[in-house]
Structures are given as structure tokens and as C-alpha cells.
Regions:
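Hot-dog-fold acyl-thioester-processing enzymes
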Residues: 13-65, 121-143
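HotDog/MaoC-like acyl-thioester-processing domains
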Residues: 20-21, 73, 78-79, 90-143
């Protein structure tokens, strides 16, 4: 993703723009033994935000995380820093939705991590995938 004019949008190769709606402040409880943001805490934030984004898109909270692609931590955050989590839909399957995610530090817009694929699957009461019958919506329309 490339930062566009230092704004709150990232542009990927298909000319889509990613918006950042979720922010978290790094607190003492979020730090590792090195004094920086614990990777596990960040992954929990990402999974939670992806769940919220997905349920808004599919209009159904009966989703499970199926897959998260490779994660590389490119930079870190420290106590008091604000991190922003951006999501966008990259694919919509019959029972699934695939998202891309960028996490950056507010103010510097330095990327902490980016994830190319987070896949959620809509499931029925039996735990089996079920069709969602939804089309991609922009986040403004979904929330």
C-alpha cells in the first residue's frame, strides 16, 4: 500500500482506497518486556477490528476467522502512541469475505504491519459454512 498525500487513505494496486476508522492507544498493559507494543496484543486488535468490519459487511455476526496470511512487524509503537487499523474488502466469496489490513502509527503514518489476506467465513448453527448473499459495500454504507 502506498500513502496518498499523507492522508488517511492507502492505495493498493487496484486503485482502491483504505480508510482508517479504528484507533487504539498503547497502554502499559499492551507492552512486551522490551517496552514496545506486544505483537499478540496487536494481533488481537486486528482480529477484533476485522470481525467488526466483517459483521458490518455481511450483516451477520456468525462469522469465524478462517485464515490470516503472513504477518511481518515492520515497526513498533510505544506507550502513549495511537495506532490506527485500516481494513478493506479484497474478495467476496459465496460463504467468505477476504480483507486486507494496514496498521500504522497515528501522526507519523509509519506502517507497523500490513496483512494481505484475512479470511472470515459465515457459519450456521451447525458450524458449517453458509452463504451470505451479500455484495461488497463501502465501509460508509456498511456501518
Amino acid at each position: 500500500f502506498d500513502l496518498i498525500n499523507n492522508r488517511n487513505f492507502y492505495k493498493n494496486g487496484s486503485d482502491k482506497f483504505m480508510k482508517f476508522y479504528s484507533r487504539k492507544m498503547v497502554a502499559a498493559k499492551d507492552l512486551n518486556s522490551n517496552g514496545s507494543l506486544f505483537g499478540g496484543r496487536l494481533l488481537a486488535w486486528i482480529d477484533e477490528e476485522a470481525f467488526i468490519f466483517t459483521t458490518c459487511q455481511l450483516k451477520d455476526p456468525s462469522v469465524v476467522t478462517r485464515y490470516i496470511s503472513n504477518i511481518e512487524f515492520l515497526s513498533t509503537a510505544r506507550i502513549g502512541d495511537i495506532v490506527e487499523i485500516g481494513m478493506e474488502v479484497v474478495d467476496m466469496g459465496r460463504t467468505s469475505i477476504t480483507l486486507a489490513c494496514v496498521v500504522r502509527k497515528k501522526g507519523t503514518e509509519k506502517i507497523i504491519t500490513q496483512i494481505d489476506k484475512i479470511v472470515f467465513v459465515l457459519v450456521g448453527h451447525d458450524g458449517q459454512p453458509k452463504p451470505h448473499y451479500q455484495k461488497v459495500k463501502f465501509i460508509d454504507e456498511a456501518i
